[in-house]
Every structure is written in C-alpha cells, then in structure tokens.
A protein has these predicted regions:
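Glycine-rich phosphate-binding active-site loops on the catalytic face of alpha/beta enzymes
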Residues: 1-5, 38-47, 82-104
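Glycine-rich beta-to-alpha transition loops that act as phosphate-gripper elements at the mouths
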Residues: 1-2, 18-23, 42-45, 64-71
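Glycine/small-residue-rich loop that forms an oxyanion/phosphate-binding "nest" at active or ligand-binding sites
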Residues: 1-23, 32-34
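Conserved, mostly hydrophobic/aromatic
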Residues: 37, 77, 112
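C-terminal helical cap(s) of enzyme catalytic domains, especially alpha/beta-barrels
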Residues: 9-11, 95-121
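Generic hydrophobic/aromatic pocket-lining and core-packing "Φ" positions
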Residues: 6, 26, 51, 74-75, ...
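Hydrophobic faces of well-ordered beta-strands that scaffold small-molecule active sites
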Residues: 16-19, 37-39, 62-67, 84-88
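Catalytic cores of alpha/beta
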Residues: 24-32, 55, 69-85
Length: 121
C-alpha cells in the first residue's frame, strides 16, 4: 500500500482492501481512515504472532490474512478477534478454475465457510 494508491482508490466507489506487511503500513492506512486491511504475505511476515501483537496496538483495525494460509491453519487465524475473514488459494485452486469445475469450487468454498462457523445455506 502506498498513500498515492490509497488516495486514488478511495476517490472511487470501488471496494478497496489495501495490503500491508508491517506496523508502519498499518499506521499509514489508519491515518488515511482505512480500518480493514489485507495482511500479505501473512505467514512470511509473522502470521498469528504478528496479528496477536497488532491487536492491542491497533484497536478497531481488522485484517484479512492471505499468503501461506491453508485449510488447516485458517481456524487459528479466524479465532483472533481482529481477523473476521481469511483468504487462500485452497478455496479455488488454479487447475480447478481452469477446468471450469465450479461444483468443486463451491464445495471448497462451503468447507472454508464452515471453518469460520458461518452458515452457507
């Protein structure tokens, strides 16, 4: 995330979830009024430990961690109070999408939603 990119995105009506990897970038985003951020690459920059450390320092800031998250680790992230959602390529593997196998994508998405205890019906 850069301030210039954020300013351009915020000037539109498009959804914008900037990516951050450091506390300094979180501070910049917060100063711009952005309180929902993508943490990427989550596992490489500290993962769960980083998000736990950021929670008390940045109250009111929520994260969507991506990068290195898989079906096995997603529940640990979703248990954190500052993580309402996670992202991961396991929900839509490249080869499954390329094959147009939307039933498998749907099944994987339903399994992912169940990890967070969300009703998919």
């Amino acid at each position: 995330m850069t301030p210039e990119l954020a300013a351009a995105a915020l000037a539109t009506e498009l959804p914008y979830i900037p990516g951050v990897a450091t506390p300094s970038e979180v501070m910049t985003a917060r100063d711009l009024g952005i309180s929902f951020l993508k943490l990427f690459p989550a596992e490489a920059v500290g993962g769960l430990a980083l998000l736990q450390a950021l929670a008390p320092v940045f109250p009111g800031v929520a994260f969507c961690p991506t990068g290195g998250i898989d079906e096995r680790s997603a529940a640990n992230y979703l248990a954190l109070p500052n993580v309402p959602i996670v992202g991961g390529s396991w929900m839509a593997p490249r080869e499954v999408v390329a094959a147009g196998d939307w039933a498998t994508v749907r099944s994987l998405a339903e399994r992912a939603a169940a990890i967070g205890g969300r009703n998919t019906a």
